[in-house]
């Protein structure tokens, strides 16, 4: 499966090749990656169980030009179960949550250790930013931004609202800010999960 990279909004107009020697190779890399069909999930995760009329749906989020989503679509119950398994066992930090039933996540702790690892990762990435590479299209500055906004390293987004008035979902940093305030034994609830293309 090809690596998924979010489209960059940095155009770099007016920069000369002499200033950014890797510009052309960066552009070619992005061009090749964007040719792949890229899908991910939006998970509705809340502190209280949400009524079904407040479930996220394929029309909740702003889609198309100037948004993170080309289009959104519903998923089957089978795909929902697979997506929840992926969330618990691959996306969230290992052992931090236990799935109870089909839609409850019980917090097991571990946020203190996790947040220190996140800070270490931010420091490591910031040390890699230099005057020579800060202007690279997908360079060290971009990688630093990714680890700050998306510490779980997932293309999935998270809809943390308990109503459907919010028209956007958020990267994993916002989910983990919510998680880091939980006490052991507290629960989160999984509402609707939708697929999106980007």
Where are these regions (language model features)?
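Serine/proline-rich low-complexity intrinsically disordered segments, especially terminal tails, linkers
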Residues: 10-11, 24-27, 33, 78, ...
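Intrinsically disordered, low-complexity boundary segments flanking structured domains
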Residues: 26-32, 144-146, 172-182
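Positively charged N-terminal leader segments that act as targeting/secretion signals
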Residues: 7-14, 19-20
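Methionine residue identity
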Residues: 1-3
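Acidic, proline/glycine-rich low-complexity IDRs
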Residues: 158-198
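Short, extreme N-terminal segment that most often corresponds to the first beta-strand
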Residues: 21-71, 188-198
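Low-complexity, serine/threonine/proline-enriched polar segments
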Residues: 65-161
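Generic extreme N-terminus detector
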Residues: 5-7, 42
């Amino acid at each position: 499966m090809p690596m998924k990279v979010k489209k960059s909004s940095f155009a770099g107009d007016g920069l000369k090749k002499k200033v950014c020697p890797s510009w052309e190779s960066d552009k070619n890399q992005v061009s090749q990656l964007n040719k792949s069909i890229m899908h991910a999930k939006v998970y509705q995760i809340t502190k209280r169980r949400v009524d079904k009329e407040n479930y996220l749906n394929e029309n909740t989020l702003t889609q198309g030009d100037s948004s993170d989503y080309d289009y959104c679509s519903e998923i089957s119950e089978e795909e929902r179960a697979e997506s929840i398994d992926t969330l618990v066992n691959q996306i969230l930090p290992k052992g931090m949550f236990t799935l109870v039933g089909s839609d409850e996540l019980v917090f097991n702790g571990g946020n203190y250790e996790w947040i220190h690892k996140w800070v270490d990762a931010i420091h490591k990435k910031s040390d890699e930013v230099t005057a020579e590479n800060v202007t690279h299209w997908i360079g060290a500055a971009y990688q630093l931004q990714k680890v700050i906004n998306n510490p779980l390293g997932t293309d999935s987004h998270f809809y943390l609202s308990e109503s459907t008035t919010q028209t956007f979902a958020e990267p994993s940093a916002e989910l983990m800010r919510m998680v880091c305030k939980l006490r052991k034994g507290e629960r989160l609830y999984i509402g609707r999960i939708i697929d999106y293309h980007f």
